[in-house]
């Protein structure tokens, strides 16, 4: 099964881009989805009911197009982008909303226009990938009311516990009671967390293999990019000591560079069961998000950070990837508001010891104003400091006026046009288009050359005007 959505070529051809009967630079981009089939390995998912089940992964590919064919001799580059906890790959990395300064907010489109083939999977339990009828498709698998203090349960449908506040209790009562439950909580068909980190490690390795086969990058290597929780998954996928899902050495041979963007950090190397146990339900639900509000005076200083309408476009994109969840929620029967379904899971595999064993050149990029409690800016510093001293290409980049939603953030006003410098990734006299533009430029440079602002190694700050300077 395959859908194709070609995009118009647009004004991407530059003088000298065409040579004879071939193109040196892309003349456009094309987007398409494809699916990767697999069988769930025994013992990988927390609930054994899913062992041996057939499943598939959705992969959203945005690739460069060369109208006359690509000229021979130049390198072919590809990247795999791994999403975070709440948003699937296509919704996270291909937001088609107007960006400040022109173009759109889509990271995948920007990289494709730079000649980079991009593949963004929806990991198991996300987007249009398999969620299982008796897994995340069952509204009865959302959380129930908590157990009593003495451990008893007085509710006939059952009770729940959770190990992480991002998986709240009684979402059947708070979000689903009207649509679709019709006024009555129901018992679970699965009573365990949906996944553990290694479930998605398996996914990532399959997608890396697929990217190498489809994109045919030079040297048979791709750049692996992890955003937010995706950083944890990427790190674990490259960890040679992983015994639950062996095969890191083969994946490492196919990865030339790594990026950790707004990454979570500081988890035990292996899975540790909490004293009260893990969550006893597989499904958690998210309502429509609002743009992050920074505390004053940062909010006043970061003019134009919130791009008008971008959050609405993102939500529409999320629901388009969730045909079941979009019919859930709300308090008026038959008039659902839509909910974003995501899995519960246990997290491990990303800490200073694991970072110290990484071998691919590594870019760490993070918003300096990230107020997500799980992903403070200090995470980026800790990751960078833990990377091997022998790593020849490694860069740390903090971006001012950027939060955890830096892929959607812009800039307006006088601050965006520095008087005595040029915006990183831009041209003299052209205003900064915000953190989203910095991320696009930084990733394109890293994927192509393993440098940031021309340097192979170092710490950098991109200031409130988009100017990059070395730090320390």
Where are these regions (language model features)?
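Catalytic histidine-centered segment of alpha/beta-hydrolase-like enzymes
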Residues: 402-434
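Conserved alpha/beta-hydrolase "acid-adjacent" motif
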Residues: 371-382, 407
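Alpha/beta-hydrolase-fold enzymes
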Residues: 223-338
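Short beta-strand/loop motif that positions the catalytic acidic residue
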Residues: 358, 364-366
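Alpha/beta-hydrolase active-site loop
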Residues: 139-214
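N-terminal cap/lid segment of alpha/beta-hydrolase-fold proteins
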Residues: 16-74
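Active-site nucleophile elbow and catalytic-triad environment of alpha/beta-hydrolase enzymes
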Residues: 334-354
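Short, surface-exposed "cap/lid" segments of acyl-processing enzymes
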Residues: 66-120, 126, 130-151, 156
């Amino acid at each position: 099964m395959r859908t194709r959505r070609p995009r118009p070529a647009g004004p991407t051809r530059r003088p000298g881009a065409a040579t004879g009967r071939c193109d040196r630079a892309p003349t456009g981009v094309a987007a398409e989805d494809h699916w990767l089939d697999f069988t769930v390995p025994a013992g990988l998912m927390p609930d054994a009911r899913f062992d041996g089940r057939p499943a598939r992964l959705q992969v959203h590919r945005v690739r460069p197009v060369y109208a006359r064919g690509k000229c021979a001799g130049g390198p072919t580059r590809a990247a795999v982008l791994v999403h975070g906890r709440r948003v699937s790959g296509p919704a996270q990395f291909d937001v088609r909303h107007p960006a400040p300064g022109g173009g759109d907010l889509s990271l995948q489109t920007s990289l494709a226009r730079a000649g980079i083939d991009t593949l963004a999977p929806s990991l198991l339990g996300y987007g249009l990938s398999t969620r299982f009828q008796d897994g995340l498709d069952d509204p009865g698998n959302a959380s129930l009311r908590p157990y009593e203090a003495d451990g008893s349960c007085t509710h006939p449908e059952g009770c729940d516990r959770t190990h992480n506040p991002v998986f709240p209790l009684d979402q059947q009562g708070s979000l689903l009671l009207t649509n679709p439950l019709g006024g009555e909580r129901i018992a679970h068909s699965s009573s365990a967390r949906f996944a553990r980190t290694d479930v998605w490690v398996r996914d990532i390795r399959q997608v890396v293999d697929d990217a190498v086969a489809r994109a045919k990058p030079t040297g048979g290597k791709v750049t692996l990019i992890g955003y937010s929780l995706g950083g944890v998954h990427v790190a674990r996928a490259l960890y040679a000591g992983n015994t639950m899902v062996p095969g890191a050495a083969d994946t490492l041979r196919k990865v030339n560079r790594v990026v950790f963007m707004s990454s979570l950090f500081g988890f035990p190397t292996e899975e540790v069961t909490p004293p009260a146990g893990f969550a006893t339900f597989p499904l958690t639900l998210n309502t429509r998000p609002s743009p992050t509000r920074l505390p004053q005076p940062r909010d006043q200083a970061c003019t134009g950070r919130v791009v008008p309408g971008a959050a609405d476009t993102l939500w529409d994109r999320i629901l388009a990837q969730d045909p079941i969840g979009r019919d859930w929620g709300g308090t008026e029967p038959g008039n659902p508001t839509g909910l974003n379904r995501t899995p519960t899971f246990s997290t491990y595999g990303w800490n200073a010891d694991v970072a110290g064993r990484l071998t691919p050149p590594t870019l760490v990029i993070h918003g300096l104003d990230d107020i997500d409690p799980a992903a403070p800016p200090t995470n980026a510093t800790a990751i960078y400091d833990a990377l091997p001293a022998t790593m020849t290409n490694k860069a740390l980049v903090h971006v001012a006026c950027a939060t955890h939603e830096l892929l959607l953030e812009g800039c307006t006003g006088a601050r965006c046009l520095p008087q005595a410098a040029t915006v990183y990734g831009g041209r003299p006299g052209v205003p900064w288009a915000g953190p989203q533009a910095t991320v696009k430029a930084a990733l394109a440079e890293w994927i192509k050359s393993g440098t940031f602002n021309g340097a192979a190694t170092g710490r950098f700050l991109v200031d409130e005007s988009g100017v990059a300077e070395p730090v320390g």
